[in-house]
UniProtKB/Swiss-Prot annotation:
<comment type="similarity">
    <text>Belongs to the SAICAR synthetase family.</text>
</comment>
<comment type="pathway">
    <text>Purine metabolism; IMP biosynthesis via de novo pathway; 5-amino-1-(5-phospho-D-ribosyl)imidazole-4-carboxamide from 5-amino-1-(5-phospho-D-ribosyl)imidazole-4-carboxylate: step 1/2.</text>
</comment>
<keyword id="KW-0436">Ligase</keyword>
<dbReference type="InterPro" id="IPR028923">
    <property type="entry name" value="SAICAR_synt/ADE2_N"/>
</dbReference>
<dbReference type="Pfam" id="PF01259">
    <property type="entry name" value="SAICAR_synt"/>
</dbReference>
<keyword id="KW-0547">Nucleotide-binding</keyword>
<dbReference type="GO" id="GO:0006189">
    <property type="term" value="P:'de novo' IMP biosynthetic process"/>
</dbReference>
<dbReference type="GO" id="GO:0005737">
    <property type="term" value="C:cytoplasm"/>
</dbReference>
<keyword id="KW-0067">ATP-binding</keyword>
<dbReference type="GO" id="GO:0005524">
    <property type="term" value="F:ATP binding"/>
</dbReference>
<dbReference type="InterPro" id="IPR018236">
    <property type="entry name" value="SAICAR_synthetase_CS"/>
</dbReference>
<keyword id="KW-0658">Purine biosynthesis</keyword>
<dbReference type="InterPro" id="IPR001636">
    <property type="entry name" value="SAICAR_synth"/>
</dbReference>
<dbReference type="GO" id="GO:0004639">
    <property type="term" value="F:phosphoribosylaminoimidazolesuccinocarboxamide synthase activity"/>
</dbReference>
<protein>
    <recommendedName>
        <fullName>Phosphoribosylaminoimidazole-succinocarboxamide synthase</fullName>
        <ecNumber>6.3.2.6</ecNumber>
    </recommendedName>
</protein>
Length: 293
C-alpha cells in the first residue's frame, strides 16, 4: 500500500488552517495551496489512522469534475502546479494530492442537491413530509428517487458540529435573492449533469454538496472539493433497492466498524484495524476508477 499522509508540514509557506481533511497554505495574497491529506473523520471526530491514497483520490476526482463541468460555472483552478510553489524537500507532500487555487471569499452556505431520500433528508421527511421546507409526495421510502432533484441547503456549522438543514429563505437572508437563486440553479444543474454522467458508469449520485465563493468583482466560482466520496453519496447502481440504505463508496466500513466498538463518539477514537483501512482505501479507489475509466 502507498504510504499515508496524516498531516502535511509545508514550512516554505504560511499555514492558514487545517480542516478535517485539507491543510491550507497561503501562496502570495491571491492564491492558496490546498493539500488533501489521508485523514478521515467519522461522527465528526478525526481518526488517528489515515486511509492510504485517499487524498490523491479526492484530488483527482475533483479535478476530473471541475474539467467536466467547467462550462456551467468558472472554478477556483489557477493552472499553477503545486510542485512550483513549495521547497524541493516538500514535493512528496504535494504530489498528486494538492492544488493551487484562487483565494475567494467563501459563501457560508452548504449548497446541497438531493436526488434521493436518504440521511438527514430522510429523517426530515419522516418527521415533516418535507426536506428543507420543500414538500414531497406522501408514501416515499428510504432511498426513494425524488420526482426531481431538490436544493436543500445547510448552514455551515462550527468545527466538530453537524451542519444544520435550512430553508431557501435562510439562503436569501444570507446572500440576497438574486445570488440565492443563482446558487440554487447552478447547484441543481451541476448535480443533474454529474448524475447523468455517473449513471453511465453504474454509479448513482444520491446527493452531494458544493461550495461556492466570490472574487473581488462578485463573480461566483465553484470551489473546494467537487463530487467526491467525501462530499457525496455514491451508490453502485446494481446494489440499489428502495427501502434500504444502499452500500456506498466512502467511509461506511469505518462507520460500521466503529458502531461495533464501545466508544462514545468523542476523541480519541479507537484505532482502526488494517482490514478496515484497506477496504476503505479500496472503496475510494473504486469510485475513482469507475468514474474516470
Amino acid at each position: 500500500m502507498t504510504s499515508a499522509l496524516h498531516q502535511s508540514s509545508i514550512k516554505s509557506l504560511p499555514l492558514l488552517g487545517r480542516g478535517k481533511v485539507r491543510d491550507m497554505y497561503a501562496v502570495g495574497d491571491d492564491k492558496l495551496l490546498i493539500v488533501a491529506s489521508d485523514r478521515i473523520s467519522a461522527f465528526d471526530v478525526i481518526l488517528d489512522d489515515p486511509i492510504p491514497g485517499k487524498g490523491q483520490v479526492l484530488t483527482e476526482l475533483t479535478e476530473f469534475w471541475l474539467n467536466k463541468l467547467a462550462h456551467i460555472l468558472p472554478n477556483h483552478s489557477t493552472g499553477v502546479r503545486p510542485e512550483d510553489v513549495v521547497a524541493p524537500d516538500e514535493l512528496d507532500q504535494v504530489r498528486g494530492r494538492a492544488v493551487v487555487v484562487k483565494r475567494l471569499k467563501p459563501i457560508l452556505v452548504e449548497a446541497v442537491a438531493r436526488g434521493y431520500l436518504i440521511g438527514s433528508g430522510w429523517k426530515d421527511y419522516q418527521a415533516t413530509g418535507a426536506v428543507c421546507g420543500i414538500a414531497l409526495p406522501a408514501g416515499l421510502q428510504q432511498a426513494s428517487k425524488l420526482p426531481q432533484p431538490i436544493f436543500t441547503p445547510a448552514a455551515k456549522a462550527e468545527f466538530g458540529m453537524h451542519d444544520e438543514n435550512v430553508d431557501f429563505a435562510h439562503v436569501v437572508r444570507e446572500v440576497g435573492q438574486e445570488m440565492a437563486e443563482r446558487i440554487r440553479d447552478v447547484t441543481l444543474r451541476l448535480y443533474t449533469e454529474a448524475a447523468q454522467f455517473a449513471a453511465t458508469k453504474g454509479i448513482i449520485i444520491a446527493d452531494t454538496k458544493f461550495e461556492f465563493g466570490l472574487d473581488d468583482d462578485g463573480t461566483l466560482y465553484l470551489m473546494d472539493e467537487v463530487l467526491t466520496p467525501d462530499s457525496s453519496r455514491f451508490w453502485p447502481a446494481d446494489g440499489y433497492r428502495v427501502g434500504i440504505s444502499p452500500p456506498s463508496f466512502d467511509k461506511q466500513f469505518v462507520r460500521d466498524w466503529l458502531e461495533t466498538q464501545d466508544w462514545d463518539k468523542t476523541p480519541p477514537a479507537p484505532r482502526l484495524p488494517q482490514e478496515v483501512l484497506q477496504k476503505t482505501a479500496a472503496k475510494y479507489r473504486e469510485a475513482l476508477d469507475r468514474l474516470v475509466a
